């Protein structure tokens, strides 16, 4: 009897949680600015997604740390060797714009927690943890603004180290 009661409570609790989430989703009304941004994004048709970070050094994909069961502390040491000496935001943006792309989406931080920008919330970033010491996002944003191309950001809240 006790097992049936606990099962019943779990089912009721789950159904209430699901119905409240469905209600929250159905009551969302995007604002004018949001709708305009969606339309603009749709009209742009073609953009380039730059998925770049420490994982590029291993040339095995952005999920390499978890897919290969790499120790986080060992993986984090990659930052000490990250020095993209040929990175030139102006050249990158010019080449992307010449391709006909209307926007760039850039991975500012992926699941391993490494940020491609300077942040006060973590020292595990391109400015504080690498010999490169330059804010890649800042440089990319300046080049996009100068050359008139939209810049969107991908930022992962997931963090394999936390």
Positions of PLM-derived features:
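Mature catalytic domains of secreted/periplasmic carbohydrate-active enzymes
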Residues: 24-162
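Bacterial Sec-dependent N-terminal signal peptides
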Residues: 1-25
